[in-house]
């Protein structure tokens, strides 16, 4: 008698992903060192080796974030988990939050804040532009928010929002300052303490050379004080010495940063079972960056990003957005007239094993996004991508000088001493 629930034989074979060079806006090809670290065997969540690994990871990410914040830790989940944990822990229903939007991920901050019950006030820029400090200050004066929430690098537009003057401004007006730096950290300058940020969340899958699945965050003393007013200890683990905060309990159990801090702190109050393999991977991502040196990594992203950008421009393609505010690690180019954008992406993937990105919303079908980030911010990856893209575009009838992209990139590398 056949088993109705027996899966097809194909489903019982191992999954073997095809070889790919991920040159889109993320995720990227993971550094082999990170994959090796993630293959290590698990230990128990209260094993001294495990808690030491957690403490070491906190210390490493303080250097990544350029901060002395005690509460620098990991949220188990994608970069969006870090965003949600920060916003739901800082915002109570009715709180006012100001979100400057210059791409898709500003809209994401708005949606999550609205789901927290906050009053969301938006200011918007045309995609491809960024805000001046004066525009944001005017909005802060008008709205008087509890929190300014802003993306630093938005991969949907490739733009990098200047943050360096916003922290002092927020401090002056009594506003908490949060940034999602998932797409930018490690490839562009980011100074948590110098820029007076109160909360930052990131992911591993861009310039940090890792897979999605862990979200490093850091919290200032001011942010921690706000969260601790809402502190809550679960009934099943609390003792007589535990006291809850006086504020409204955080609506999410999983993303309750007060409880997560108790788990990462000395008392190790049980909250969840740590995603041990992701912890190993996140630790190795930080180690790789800090061994290279943060400034050296940023310079590497600048050089390879410049080579890719100028190589694409030399192939008779128009660059998207304000180039003076572009991230080092991703560039947008308009799809040339008469060229089938998805057919080009398909040929790049199927014929060359290279992935480049499309875009979202008002830019969908109008631009490609090409990344040079993390492990793929390398000369060979840039040149391979330019060679493949030229071959595909020429078959689509796009006019350009033969080898122009690669020649220009090689000129840039010569200028940069590579």
Predicted region positions:
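Active-site phosphate-binding strand-loop segment of PLP-dependent enzymes
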Residues: 131-186, 199, 207
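Conserved beta-loop-alpha segment that forms the PLP phosphate-binding cup at the N-terminus of a helix
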Residues: 70-98, 102, 106-110
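PLP-dependent enzyme catalytic core of the Aspartate aminotransferase-like
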Residues: 2-3, 362, 366-418
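Active-site C-terminal subdomain of aminotransferase-like
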Residues: 29-30, 205-310, 314, 416-418
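A glycine-/small-polar-enriched, mobile loop at the entrance of the PLP active site in fold-type I
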Residues: 19-75, 80
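Conserved active-site segment immediately N-terminal to the catalytic lysine
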Residues: 193-205
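Conserved PLP-binding catalytic core of the aspartate aminotransferase-like
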Residues: 318-351
